[in-house]
């Protein structure tokens, strides 16, 4: 067996071992009591990085996307989800969680790390958008070349400290956040991306891909929550009046 063959074999073994360690780490995270239909706050378990939220932090209507930055279907869904999160930003809580499918998308976890690293400088959504907009440019990049793509996009996204950005990509903190998101995805039965939940209910792709139908569902949820809030306010006022 040639020396080069042994080197290739060693690299493959290292990659497989790394994947096994990563999966084992996910399986050790206990998210059994976590309510995935709400904003997950920062904790030691997720690297002290809270859920990334667009829109209202206090919205009663919760839209969660489990996404993979290298996934072509996620790229296709990106314009629609951008439209929805902007249109309903005053009433909708949009949450993005990482679910990189590393078996078929070798650059997905690195891209997730780049987004999280940008997030540590307040530029998660800007980097999120760049990764999807320029997916064709970096998706097939070799492992040793992808960092240069991420650095270029980070600069465009407004990330100021590039050395910190590069260090954060490799950090335990960012890795813990991605691993935690994957544990949440596993809890929610996610096996493909994008997987979308509205108020805790999984929405099939045919439904969310129908823009008008999905917009109608979101609006109905918003209206229902507002109606429920009005009823609670009326009851509180009545109880206060009776107590006089």
Spans of features found by a protein language model:
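A short beta-strand-turn-helix
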Residues: 44-61, 86
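C-terminal cap of thioredoxin/glutaredoxin-like
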Residues: 1-25, 152-244
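Ser/Thr/Pro/Gly-rich low-complexity linker/stalk segments immediately outside membranes or between
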Residues: 26-41
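A generic local structural motif
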Residues: 47-52, 80-81, 182-183
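Short clusters of hydrophobic/aromatic residues that line enzyme substrate/ligand-binding pockets
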Residues: 53-54, 138, 203
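Structural alpha/beta surface segment adjacent to cysteine/selenocysteine redox centers
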Residues: 64-70, 75-155, 186-188, 207, ...
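Envelope-exposed proteins and targeting segments
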Residues: 59-62, 90, 192-194
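A generic fold-level signal
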Residues: 56-58, 106, 190-191
